[in-house]
């Protein structure tokens, strides 16, 4: 009879495959941050109903599904116009990814930068390392740790002092 693997083992296997693919295009500090976050998750696993903060949340389906990486983006040319006029900025995400071409970011105030986190890491690696490298989720936040380990990108917002 085959041994049933626990959820943490499944995520660790999936992480190893992604880490191998990322090693050539991510800085070492980010790979280490991801590994540290996975270690936090691995030490605690998915919370269950015995965990006070999660007693009303059943994560059994997540434990059976495992992690499925987001598919590459398909190109989209436009988004529906807002019902009311927008006098301001618009940040568009499609399938969890920042879409600068569809966002309205013209005439940002001086000193304000909005871009994808991946672009910022490439453009300002030392700054991002200093801001991110010590941000490991605590053991009481296993889903935050799992998110940190597997995240693909994000939004970078910098407002100069």
Q: Language-model features: where?
A:
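Glycine-rich and polybasic anion-binding loops at the starts of cofactor/ligand-binding domains
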Residues: 1-161
């Amino acid at each position: 009879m085959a041994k049933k693997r626990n959820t943490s083992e499944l995520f660790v296997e999936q992480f190893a495959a992604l880490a191998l693919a990322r090693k050539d295009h991510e800085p070492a500090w980010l790979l280490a941050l991801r590994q540290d976050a996975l270690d936090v998750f691995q030490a605690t696993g998915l919370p269950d109903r015995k965990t006070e903060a999660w007693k009303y949340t059943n994560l059994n389906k997540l434990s059976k599904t495992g992690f499925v990486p987001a598919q590459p983006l398909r190109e989209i040319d436009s988004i529906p116009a807002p019902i009311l006029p927008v006098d301001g900025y618009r940040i568009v995400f499609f399938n969890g990814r920042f879409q600068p071409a569809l966002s309205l970011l013209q005439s940002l105030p001086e000193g304000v930068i909005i871009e994808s986190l991946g672009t910022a890491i490439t453009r300002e690696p030392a700054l991002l390392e200093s801001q991110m490298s010590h941000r490991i989720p605590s053991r009481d936040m296993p889903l935050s740790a799992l998110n940190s380990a597997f995240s693909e990108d994000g939004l970078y917002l910098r407002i100069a002092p």
